[in-house]
């Protein structure tokens, strides 16, 4: 069984180099693919020097987004004979046992398309997995306050996520996951119409529709420092929110088949949330 990992770099050379150095001696990883997503800094000159028998560096001609960049790496890995491929944001950290635990799930279940472990932030808070939602529930999940109020309707019960070494879920956190060659070739991986945000839901939808299952491995975890390229390149909170809302609207139309009236309500909710984001941003700037 051969396994690779894709690291997507966009103006985040420091984190990318750190992660590469941590992973390069892991025997469980046959190959490391670093995709430079048309960085505008000095990444290219440094990354070119990493090319060797274990590391392949791919330079995208233009930045077409998070999904498109990772798909470049996936396609390279599977065309070169890999059976499974992880992706990892540059600002993540792993122990080698993490990869072994995740891969073990593919061997134990049938029709597994995607697996990930628990994600932890630097403060120990965990983000795990969540169900695919109807239009109404998806609307409720957009707002920070409604998400908290209706959390019992929007997320898996804690007991469910802790009952077994791995559990079937719909959506996995996107900062690191592992996809099988078969599932990628059948679904095409990420929807490249989405530049940034909503990728987790989209790939969850595509896999389920193709008959594949996603699992959360509950006995392993990785660290996500959340200091990556998105916050570096999009420093404005309002700017990030606008980009998120563009993807939310696209997801509602394309994958939830939202009608005209539903899209109207979505735009109203988004306008309120954007206003709250602007006020919060102004408060932080004082």
Model-derived features: positions:
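A conserved acidic beta->alpha catalytic loop
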Residues: 13, 36-45, 62
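Short, acidic, metal-binding catalytic loop of nucleotide-sugar glycosyltransferases
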Residues: 21-30
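Glycine-rich, basic loop-to-helix element that forms the pyrophosphate-binding segment
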Residues: 60-80
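Short beta-strand-to-loop acidic/aromatic patch adjacent to the donor-nucleotide binding site
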Residues: 81-93
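Conserved donor NDP-sugar-binding/catalytic core segment of glycosyltransferases
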Residues: 96-129
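Short, flexible, basic/aromatic active-site loop/helix in glycosyltransferases
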Residues: 134-169
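A short, conserved alpha-helix in the catalytic core of glycosyltransferases
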Residues: 170-189, 193-221
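Active-site-adjacent helix/loop segment of glycosyltransferases
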Residues: 204-284
């Amino acid at each position: 069984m051969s396994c690779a990992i894709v690291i997507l770099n966009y103006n985040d050379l420091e984190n990318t180099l750190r992660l590469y150095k941590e992973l390069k001696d892991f025997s469980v990883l046959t190959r490391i693919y670093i995709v430079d997503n048309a960085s505008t800094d000095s990444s290219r000159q440094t990354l070119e020097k990493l090319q060797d028998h274990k590391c392949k560096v791919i330079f995208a001609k233009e930045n077409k987004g998070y999904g498109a960049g990772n798909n470049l790496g996936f396609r390279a890995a599977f065309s070169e004979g890999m059976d499974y491929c992880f992706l990892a944001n540059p600002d993540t950290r792993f122990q080698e046992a993490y990869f072994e635990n995740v891969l073990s799930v593919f061997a134990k279940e049938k029709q597994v398309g995607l697996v990930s472990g628990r994600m932890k932030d630097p403060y120990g808070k965990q983000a795990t997995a969540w169900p695919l939602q109807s239009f109404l529930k998806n609307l409720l999940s957009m707002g920070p306050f409604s998400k908290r109020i209706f959390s019992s309707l929007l997320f898996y019960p804690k007991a469910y996520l802790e009952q077994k070494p791995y559990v079937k879920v719909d959506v996995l956190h996107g900062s690191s996951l592992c996809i099988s060659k078969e599932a990628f070739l059948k679904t095409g991986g990420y929807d490249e119409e989405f530049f940034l945000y909503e990728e987790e839901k989209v790939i969850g939808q595509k896999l389920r529709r193709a008959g594949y299952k996603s699992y959360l491995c509950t006995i392993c975890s990785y660290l996500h420092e959340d200091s990556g390229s998105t916050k570096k390149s999009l420093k404005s909170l309002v700017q990030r929110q606008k980009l998120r809302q563009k993807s939310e609207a696209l997801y509602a139309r394309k994958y939830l088949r939202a009608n005209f009236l539903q899209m109207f309500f979505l735009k109203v909710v988004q306008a309120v949330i954007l206003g709250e984001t602007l006020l919060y941003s102004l408060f932080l700037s004082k």
